[in-house]
Structures are given as structure tokens and as C-alpha cells.
Amino acid sequence: MATIAAASGATGLVMCPLNENKFVDDSPEKAAGLRTALKAIRSILGAHGLKGFVEPLGFPVSSLRLKQEALAAIDDIGGADVYTVVHDTFHHRGAGESRLYPSRTGLVHISGLEDPAISFMDMLDSHRVLVGSKDRLGNVEQLRQLYAGGYDGIVSFEPFAKEVHDLADPIGAVRASIGFVREALERA
């Protein structure tokens, strides 16, 4: 994958943890395994001139839920030159994180959650829609804080909901969502 990414002109690879649909505890073995994996992948990324974007998944069943845990592992292996974290607004809210790491963030993913019947602990990828006025995840505030902290990288959409994929005019919907986010950020 690293060979293909480098050949395509990509600057990095997003790395997501296991999401096994079962609770993964915070054992010393799990922490050691994360560090071992990051060390091994670091040499592969380095050989291809790529960065590693570590994306904790905020689901309760994820083997890596928190950016803080990812950054501790990155620091423990001396990997800050290769690794940054992905700030995903959906997973940030789902994990119940309050701290953002703008200077350690290499990529931002945004998506909205509008259905008031879905709790943050129960939300799934299938609930992720484009960001709009009914957003419950606080996308605009998260972006505002990231920018205020110095983040100046890429922001990309990650709406996985079927209703988004089935839109008659997806380009228009994406443009409307971009417009909403821009206008909301300008109102700061």
C-alpha cells in the first residue's frame, strides 16, 4: 500500500485501528502492541517518504479510541517526525474527548449527526451525514478551535450515511455543506 501511495503522489497514509465489535481493555499488552506496530510501520512509511496519519476511532469497541493514547505511543517511540493524528469530529465526540491537538493534527475529517434520537455512544458510521444547521457534533466549534490552535491542513468530508450516497445532487449538497461551514466559521 505504501508503494502505491507514494507512486500516486500521496503524502501519507491514514491508519485506523481494529474495530472488532467487542470491548478492548487498556492492558499493557495492548499498549505494547500499539508501539510495536507504530515502530514497524514507521520504517515502511520512511522508506516511501510518507507520513502516517493515526486515526483513533471513538467507538467503544475500538482498539484505539483516544488521540491522547495515540500521541503517547507516538511520543514513546520518538515518532513525531513521521506520525500525526487525524481529528475526526465524529470520533472526537463519540470518544467524549475534550482536548484537541491542533499542532499534532495532520488531517481533519468532518461529518454531521442530526438525528436527536441517536446518542453519541450509539452513533455509527451509517449515521454520518454532511454538516449542516442541525449538526449535533459541534463541527464548526471543533474547527474553530483547531484553527485557533494553529491547524492549517486539509479538512475532508466523511459522510457514510446511505441517504448522502443516494442524493440526487451530491455535488450541490457538498457545496451547500461547505458553504454552511464557511459562513459559520466567519461568524466567529
Locate the predicted segments by residue:
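Hydrophobic faces of well-ordered beta-strands that scaffold small-molecule active sites
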Residues: 13-15, 52-54, 83-87, 106-110, ...
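Active-site acidic/histidine proton-transfer and metal-coordination neighborhood
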Residues: 1-84, 169
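Active-site beta-loop-alpha junctions enriched in small/polar residues
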Residues: 18-20, 57-59, 88-92, 110-115, ...
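Conserved, mostly hydrophobic/aromatic
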Residues: 5, 52, 70, 88, ...
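C-terminal helical cap(s) of enzyme catalytic domains, especially alpha/beta-barrels
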Residues: 167-188
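Gly/Pro-rich active-site loop or hairpin
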Residues: 25, 64-67, 91-152, 164-171
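Alpha-helical packing segments of well-folded alpha/beta enzyme cores
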Residues: 1, 37, 41, 142, ...
